[in-house]
């Protein structure tokens, strides 16, 4: 999704928020660099690494969760519970965190 080339890095609020099953995270990359988007629980544990790759300048979207089994209704450690989660964009010298809410 490379519509217009942005002149700065930016992390948008996810949509929808709150979400039930999936949500979309949109972000802008100002120049070619390594991009990482990580989702954490409120205890700082990594839930999922959405992106960890070099990207050209542009505007992108990524869905959370990406792992097919992450929302299964079982007792595994991978099951997401209702509540707040943080997601972080790291690109170049830019870092930004946002909060999202899961309400099943």
What annotation goes with each model-predicted range?
Residues 1-15, 19-39, 49, 61-73:
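Glycine-centered coil/turn sites that cap beta-strands in beta-rich domains
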Residues 52, 62-64, 98-100:
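Generic detection of short hydrophobic beta-strand segments and adjacent strand-loop junctions
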Residues 47-56:
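Solvent-exposed serine/threonine-rich low-complexity stretches and specific carbohydrate-binding patches
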Residues 32, 57-59, 82-84:
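Extracellular Ig-like/FN3 beta-sandwich strand-entry sites
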Residues 78, 82-104:
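C-terminal tail/sorting-segment detector
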């Amino acid at each position: 999704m490379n519509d217009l080339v942005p002149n700065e890095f930016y992390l948008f609020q996810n949509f929808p928020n709150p979400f039930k099953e999936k949500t979309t995270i949109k972000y802008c990359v100002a120049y070619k660099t390594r991009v990482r988007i990580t989702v954490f629980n409120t205890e700082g544990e990594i839930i999922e690494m959405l992106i960890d790759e070099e990207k050209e300048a542009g505007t992108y979207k990524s869905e959370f969760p990406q792992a097919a089994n992450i929302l299964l209704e079982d007792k595994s450690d991978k099951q997401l519970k209702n509540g707040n989660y943080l997601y972080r964009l790291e690109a170049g010298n830019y870092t930004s965190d946002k909060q999202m809410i899961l309400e099943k």
